[in-house]
């Protein structure tokens, strides 16, 4: 089958993917001397590891939908054979020549997850190819729909509709409930995956794809559309980022401060300030 071809390619790309990029420290989310699981991992090296793992598992690619395996009649909902379904020709895709790369390809891309160090996995592990496949689909949509933040937010809220039913738990499932579901095959929290994708773009170095206020507004719209689902997920992300400020890149610390102030201004500055009171008590005497 086709399995031999990607395996041969992976052998050739291993030396490139395993070599650290000369500029990786310039775009690292956290200080390179700190052992931070959430960042500092090159997307290229991650994908190399993920693809090798997937090859060993027979290319299951569990997160990819397979609609042709469950074809049903629109009126009777009865199963239909795939051969009887009306085929639609795929349009020709024209790739511009030459492709304008711009400035971004000069720097490597690192994978950031604000949910990487939790006691329970609510987002795909970085060793799982699903983390790259789902993140890629979400990031592409976020950056391509920059002209309509509301449509972007609605898409992020409904991401479970675009993947197999076993991929995600029901929206707004409590975090404590995730502990009970922990096992060999555990579905992920769709709102965590969505928030993770937005933060990966908001904290992209050296610069984000769009103006930072766009990503601010997407998170705000998500909270307005599904507050019961997004608010708890966003709260855990905020706590992680706050606790990581000492090791975070200074530019990203400023971005976090700007976003947090902007976000709270839309919701009456409501936050559990008592959580941080003890840590910052020394500043109250100034």
Q: Where in this protein do the model-derived segments appear?
A:
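Eukaryotic alpha-helical solenoid repeat scaffolds
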Residues: 1-286
């Amino acid at each position: 089958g086709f399995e031999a071809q990607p395996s041969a390619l992976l052998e050739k790309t291993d030396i490139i993917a395993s070599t650290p990029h000369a500029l990786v420290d310039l775009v690292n989310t956290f200080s390179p001397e700190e052992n931070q699981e959430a960042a500092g991992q090159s997307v290229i090296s991650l994908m190399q590891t993920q693809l090798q793992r997937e090859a060993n598992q027979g290319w299951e690619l569990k997160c990819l939908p397979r609609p042709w395996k469950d074809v049903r009649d629109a009126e009777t909902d009865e199963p239909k054979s795939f051969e009887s379904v009306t085929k639609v020709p795929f349009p020709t895709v024209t790739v511009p020549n030459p492709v304008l790369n711009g400035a971004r390809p000069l720097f490597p891309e690192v994978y950031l997850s604000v949910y990487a160090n939790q006691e329970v996995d609510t987002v795909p592990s970085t060793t799982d190819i699903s983390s790259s496949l789902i993140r890629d689909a979400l990031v592409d949509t976020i950056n391509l729909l920059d002209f309509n933040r509301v449509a972007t937010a609605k898409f992020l809220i409904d991401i479970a509709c675009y993947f197999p039913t076993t991929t995600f738990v029901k929206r707004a499932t409590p975090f404590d409930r995730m502990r009970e579901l922990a096992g060999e095959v555990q579905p992920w929290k769709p709102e965590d995956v969505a928030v993770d994708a937005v933060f990966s773009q908001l904290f992209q170095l050296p610069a984000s794809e769009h103006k930072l206020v766009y990503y601010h507004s997407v998170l705000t719209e998500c909270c307005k559309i599904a507050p019961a689902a997004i608010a708890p997920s966003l709260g855990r992300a905020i706590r992680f980022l706050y606790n990581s400020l000492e090791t975070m890149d200074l530019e990203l610390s400023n971005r976090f401060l700007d976003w947090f102030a902007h976000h709270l201004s839309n919701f009456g500055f409501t936050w559990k300030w008592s959580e941080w009171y003890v840590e910052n008590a020394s500043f109250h005497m100034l």
